[in-house]
Amino acid sequence: MTDDKAGPSGLSLKEAEEIHSYLIDGTRVFGAMALVAHILSAIATPWLG
């Protein structure tokens, strides 16, 4: 019997890749929101302009 579980997490490779894709998507959304927040705060502060 073959064991398709990857590493100590007990997840299969397909499951690990699915979780990883969600993590990457969440990081991209967070980064985009942070970028927008930084741009808006730079526009709103009079001493930077």
From Swiss-Prot:
GO terms for biological process: photosynthesis, light reaction. It is found in: Cell inner membrane. Residues 1-21 are cytoplasmic. This is Light-harvesting protein B-800/850 beta chain. One of its GO terms (cellular component) is plasma membrane light-harvesting complex. Pfam families: LHC. The gene is pucB. Keywords: Antenna complex, Bacteriochlorophyll, Cell inner membrane, Cell membrane, Chlorophyll, Chromophore, Formylation, Light-harvesting polypeptide, Magnesium, Membrane, Metal-binding, Transmembrane, Transmembrane helix. Belongs to the antenna complex beta subunit family. The chain crosses the membrane at residues 22-44. Coiled coil: none annotated. It is a single-pass type II membrane protein. GO terms for molecular function: bacteriochlorophyll binding; electron transporter, transferring electrons within the cyclic electron transport pathway of photosynthesis activity; metal ion binding.
